[in-house]
């Protein structure tokens, strides 16, 4: 993760984040779309977005802006792929926490910068994210997986939609 205010943001560091979040999504959507179209049976694509799309944070410009572009690519893909029976939806979690074998290795990378940016230790960072949502929920990978499962089990005829998995962040998602 890259924590930097826009005025100090290194362009090459930004481009690394952009290549993963935007170019990676574009290439994946294009390849999956071609495959699912050729297969002729339709299908589902679920993009893991972020609460940072509707509610970015200061110092997280590279992440927030590139994930917003990724999210928008998903919305465009939903328009372009619907005629082939392909549904494209997004899941937008806040910070996802786990323990033991369910703890994401991502936090080893992004956690220290986020902790420094907020002046918190690991327990304090988790409490910060938990305490700011309406349900005071600790968002876990299982919560995110359940939202993905909702889309891919085709319980509703939905494409181009976003499910927030954030415990109810008042400023992140129109409710």
Regions found by a protein language model. Give the residues of each.
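Active-site helix of classical SDR
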Residues: 29, 66, 74
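Residue(s) in the substrate-gating loop at a strand-loop-helix junction
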Residues: 50
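Amphipathic alpha-helical dimer-interface segment in Rossmann-like NAD(P)H-dependent oxidoreductases
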Residues: 20-40, 78-79, 153
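C-terminal substrate-recognition "lid" of short-chain dehydrogenase/reductases
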Residues: 134-165, 170
């Amino acid at each position: 993760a890259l924590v930097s205010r826009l005025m100090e943001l290194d362009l090459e560091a930004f481009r690394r984040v952009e290549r993963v979040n935007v170019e990676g999504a574009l290439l994946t959507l294009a390849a999956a779309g071609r495959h699912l179209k050729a297969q002729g049976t339709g299908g589902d694509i679920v993009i893991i977005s972020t609460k940072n799309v509707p509610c970015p944070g200061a110092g997280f410009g590279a992440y927030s802006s590139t994930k917003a572009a990724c999210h928008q690519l998903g919305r465009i893909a939903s328009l372009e792929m619907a005629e082939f029976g392909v549904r494209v939806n997004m899941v937008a979690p806040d910070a996802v926490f786990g323990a033991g074998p369910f703890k994401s290795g991502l936090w080893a990378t992004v956690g220290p910068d986020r902790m420094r940016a907020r002046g918190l230790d690991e327990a304090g960072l988790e409490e910060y994210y938990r305490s700011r949502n309406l349900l005071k929920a600790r968002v876990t990978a299982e919560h995110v997986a359940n939202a993905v499962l909702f889309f891919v089990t085709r319980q509703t005829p939905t494409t181009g939609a976003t499910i927030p998995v954030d415990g109810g962040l008042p400023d992140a998602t129109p409710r």
